[in-house]
A protein has these predicted regions:
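N-terminal binding-site loop/beta-alpha segment at the start of enzyme catalytic domains
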Residues: 1-83
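Conserved, mostly hydrophobic/aromatic
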Residues: 4, 16, 53, 69, ...
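Short, well-ordered coil/turn segments that N-cap beta-strands
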Residues: 9-14, 48-51, 79-83, 116-120, ...
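Short, acidic/polar
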Residues: 30-44, 98-113, 163-169
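Acidic-and-aromatic substrate-binding clefts and catalytic sites of carbohydrate-active enzymes
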Residues: 56-66, 92-97, 130-133, 185-191
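Acidic (Asp/Glu)-rich catalytic clusters
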Residues: 70-81, 111-116, 170-174, 198
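Active-site groove signature of glycoside hydrolases
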Residues: 111-131
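Beta/alpha (TIM)-barrel catalytic core signal, keyed to glycine-rich beta->alpha loops juxtaposed to Asp/Glu
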Residues: 127-315
Length: 315
């Protein structure tokens, strides 16, 4: 395990992402039953390879991911010692309100679903949904998060979203101890590398989510035609095919290389991988331990798309 930046939280290099457990077929293309979701969380808690669970108020209808996690936790008498759970505050799903008042209510809903009286890590989720001025206004989301921390309802604060420059703006406030972004440090996209390196050097915890680029690097572009939950570019798909072919020649699943690309980065504390079943938990642990020839890394790097195709191209 490694300390998550300067938080004092000790986490495993793998973190379980739980948005698939909310059963969102429109996003993932499949259903996950409540029973299956609870079994998946149980599989994580029963093992010793992963001690870190990531969720959010907004995962699924009426917070179904948190509710299902809460069922698993209650079945074990609460959050087991040594397990770190992070959740995120989200706007009101009906009105879109993302005020300070809503941030407080979001956490209250999460704590009720999870059966907890506090969380170890609380993220401001996808702040790109409002302006930076709104996010940092007096009485707004950031100020309210700081109040929740002072009140002991959240031990540590993070910011989790997409656009790297916006994440940098929020880190520069000095309130957030952890940063999470998704799909921006993968075999196909390096948008977040500078953000991650800078944050790591400042003692900020770095979480890299969606190392498979929304599934393309795990399933292949034929089965998963979208990159990063919606974007499709033929050049990116062609690069994924070339990478898969290179990995196949080396006798390695491309998914293993995609996952370990993040795990081997010295400036990433933990990599968030979505799981939908106990089998996927076991598969993820196995992929993390797969031996990869050194020569494959250089070949994969040579096949990566250029910066103009990244989600956040540099200026």
């Amino acid at each position: 395990m490694i300390e998550l930046g300067s938080t004092g939280l000790r986490v495993t290099p793998l973190c379980v992402g739980t948005s698939p457990l909310a059963s969102m077929p429109g996003l993932y293309g499949y259903e996950v039953s409540e029973r299956r979701a609870v079994e998946t969380v149980d599989a994580v808690l029963a093992g010793d390879a992963i001690n870190f669970i990531d969720t959010s108020n907004g995962y699924g209808a009426d917070g179904s991911a948190e509710r299902r996690i809460g069922l698993a936790l209650r079945g074990r008498g609460g959050l087991p010692p040594g397990v770190v759970l992070a959740t995120k505050v989200d706007p009101d799903p009906h009105s879109g309100d993302f005020s300070g008042k809503r941030v407080r209510r979001s956490l209250e809903e999460s704590l009720e679903r999870l059966g907890l009286d506090r969380v170890q890590l609380l993220h401001l989720h996808d702040p790109e949904r409002i302006s930076f001025a709104e996010g940092t206004a007096p009485g707004g989301p950031v100020e309210t998060l700081a109040e929740l921390k002072r009140e002991g309802l959240a031990e540590h604060l993070g910011v989790a979203g997409g656009p790297v420059e916006l994440m940098r703006q929020y880190l520069d406030i000095g309130v957030f101890e952890v940063v999470l972004t998704h799909n921006r440090y993968t075999l196909l996209d390096r948008s977040a590398e500078k953000l991650f390196r800078d944050a790591y050097a400042r003692g900020i915890g770095v979480l890299n989510a969606a190392p498979y680029g929304g599934g393309m690097l795990a399933k292949g572009p034929e089965k998963q035609q979208k990159y990063a939950y919606g974007r499709r570019d033929d050049t990116i798909a062609a690069a994924a095919v070339a990478m898969r072919d290179a990995a196949t020649r080396a006798g390695v699943p491309l998914a293993a290389a995609a996952l370990q690309f993040s795990l081997r980065a010295p400036f990433v504390h933990s990599t968030v991988v979505g799981v939908s079943s106990p089998e996927r938990v076991a598969d993820t642990v196995a992929l993390a331990g797969t031996a990869i020839p050194d020569a494959l890394w250089a070949e994969l790097d040579s096949l990566a798309p250029g910066p103009r195709l990244w989600l956040d191209p540099p200026d």
